[in-house]
Amino acid sequence: MTQVAKKILVTCALPYANGSIHLGHMLEHIQADVWVRYQRMRGHEVNFICADDAHGTPIMLKAQQLGITPEQMIGEMSQEHQTDFAGFNISYDNYHSTHSDENRELSELIYTRLKENGFIKNRTISQLYDPEKGMFLPDRFVKGTCPKCKSADQYGDNCEVCGATYSPTELIEPKSVVSGATPVMRDSEHFFFDLPSFSEMLQAWTRSGALQEQVANKMQEWFESGLQQWDISRDAPYFGFEIPNAPGKYFYVWLDAPIGYMGSFKNLCDKRGDTTSFDEYWKKDSDAELYHFIGKDIVYFHSLFWPAMLEGSHFRKPTNLFVHGYVTVNGAKMSKSRGTFIKASTWLKHFDADSLRYYYTAKLSSRIDDIDLNLEDFVQRVNADIVNKVVNLASRNAGFINKRFDGVLAAELADPQLYKTFTDAAAVIGEAWESREFGKAIREIMALADVANRYVDEQAPWVVAKQEGRDADLQAICSMGINLFRVLMTYLKPVLPTLSERVEAFLNSELNWDAIEQPLLGHKVNTFKALYNRIDMKQVEALVEASKEEVKAAAAPVTGPLADFPIQETITFDDFAKIDLRVALIENAEFVDGSDKLLRLTLDLGGEKRNVFSGIRSAYPDPQALIGRQTVMVANLAPRKMRFGVSEGMVMAAGPGGKDIFLLSPDDGAKPGQQVK
C-alpha cells in the first residue's frame, strides 16, 4: 500500500574541494543514496543534494602551490567529484559549491539576522601567528596535543580522538603546519557566535528522541562540560566570503559550509523555476523533513552550531542527523603504503559500483559503528549473494522460458502461498530500509533467496524438461522462479541500480515496490542475457597495486610555475622603483656566431638604439620573425661586456627556459620608449 507522500530533503556532508573522493567518502554517499532510492520507491517527494565545501586556507595554499587560482582548482575538483559520484550512481538532484552566489547571500542573511538578534559578539583575541610565513594560522594549520584527552598530533579546531572542539590557542605545544615554526601570539579582533544562549533549546532538541542514542549521549557530555562561544571569523589572507562591514575579516569555513546545504537547494529551486519550495522546506514551521547524513567526526558542528545558527536566524532545524562510523580496510585504517587508501575512480577501473554498494549496505546499521571492507570477504560475499543466490535464480529459469515458451510466463502461480510469503516480507524489509538497518534488510532478502533456490532445487525444472507431457509444469515452475526473482530484485533495487536496470530490461517490466502484489502472469519477458559477472581476487590484487602506484605518483614533487620557481623575498616599493622598464621595438634580430643560445637584438627606444644579447635562440629559431615586434626591456641595467660584444639591457620574457621562453609584449598602441609602470 502506498504511504502518505512526504516532502523530504536529504543531504550528505560536503566533500572538501582539495582532494579526491575515496572509499571512506563513499560509505556515506552510498548509505544516503540507498535510503533516498527507497523513499522514492515508496512515492515520497525527495530532494537529494550535496555540494563541494570550497573555502578555507588549505584550498588557498594548495592553489598557490599548483600555480592556479582557487576558483580554477575548486572548479576542476567539482567536476572530478561529480564524475565519481555519478560513477557510483549516487542519485543527486543537485550538486553545487559553497563558493556560489546563493551561499554568499544566505551566509550574509544568517549572519545579519544573528547579529541583529544579539548573537554575534566582538572581541579582541590573541591568535597564533606564523612568524616565518607572516600569516595568522587557521585552526587546521596548527597541530599539537589535545587539551582535553592529551592525544598528540591533533588539529587546532577539534580532536579526532575524543571529538572535542577548542581554540587553537588551547593546544599544548602547538606547531605551524605550514612552516613547522612555533607560532607566536598576536592580537586580532574576531567575531563570535553566542552558542551558550541556545543551550536550553539544544538540550530539548537532544531529548526529543529523534537523535541516535550515541549522538544524544555525546551531546549530553558537551552540555555538562559547558558550551563556549564559537569563533566564526578569520583574518585575511583567506579564501571565502568577506564578512559584511568588516574589511579583511572572513567567515570561518564552518559557518558557510552547512549553509551550503541551503545554497545547493536554493540553486536547485532556481534551476526548476520553483519560487516556493525553498521557503516551504526551510521556514521555521516547515512540515517537510530534513535529514543530514554525516560522519561521526563532524557531529559537534551539526548537532550544536548548525541547529543553533538556524534557530537564531529563524530557519527550521534538521529533523534528524544520521551519523555513521569510519571505513577500515582489511581490519586497519586505510593505508597508502599498503594500497588500501583507494580512490573512488580507481575502484571503478577494477570493479563495478554495485559491488561496493552491496557490500557496504550489507554491513550498515543505524548505529555509529565503523565498517570494515575486508577485500577477501568482499569477493566471497558478492559472488555468493549477488551471483549465486540472486542472479543465478533468474538464469536457472529464464533459459527454459525463452527456449520452450517463447518468453511467455505461465498464466497462474505454481505456489501462491510461497509467493505471498515473499510479498508479505515487504513490511519487515521496508521497515529495515526506513530505519537504516540495512544489514538486517539484506539478511532478510538473502534468506528469501535461499528459499527461492530451494524451491527450484526441489522442483528440478531440468528434470521436468526431459519428461514428455510436462510442458505446463515446466512453464509454471520456471515462471514461479522468475516471479520470486522479481520480488527479490524489487527489494534490492535501492542498492543495485545498474543490475536493476538490466533486470527490468529482461523482465520487460519496471521494478516497483507496490507492484509486487501482482505477479507477472501471461507476461512476455525478453531474451535472457548475463546479468552479472563473478569477481575474483586477481581484481583485488590489481586494485591494490594500482592504488600503490597512484600514491607513488602523487608523492612526486609538485610541479607548476610557483612550485618550480617560488616567489622571491619581498621587496619594498622603493626597490621596485629603481627598475626602469621600457617599451622597445625589435628593429633587427640575428644569430650570434659562436653561440647556440644567443640572439643579437637591435632595439629602438624611440630615439635611442640599444644592442642586447638574449638567450632566447631555442625558443625563436627564426630571428627574422621577431623583427617589427614590440617587447619590454630593462633599460637601466648596467651594460655587460661579453665576448661577442656589449649587451646594453635585458628583454623581459616568461617561462622556465629552453624552448619554453615567451617574450613579453605590450598591448597595441604602446610606443617605443614608453615607461612600463
Swiss-Prot record:
Binding site for ATP: K336
Protein name: Methionine--tRNA ligase
GO biological process: methionyl-tRNA aminoacylation
Matches recorded under CDD domains: Anticodon_Ia_Met (cd07957), MetRS_core (cd00814), tRNA_bind_EcMetRS_like (cd02800)
Residue interval(s) of motif 'HIGH' region: 15-25
Reaction equation(s) it catalyzes: tRNA(Met) + L-methionine + ATP = L-methionyl-tRNA(Met) + AMP + diphosphate
GO cellular component terms listed in the entry, alphabetical order: cytosol
Gene Ontology MF annotations: ATP binding; metal ion binding; methionine-tRNA ligase activity; tRNA binding
Binding-site positions, Zn(2+): C146, C149, C159, C162
Role summary: Is required not only for elongation of protein synthesis but also for the initiation of all mRNA translation through initiator tRNA(fMet) aminoacylation.
Cofactor comment: Binds 1 zinc ion per subunit.
Family: Belongs to the class-I aminoacyl-tRNA synthetase family. MetG type 1 subfamily.
tRNA-binding domain boundaries: 575-677
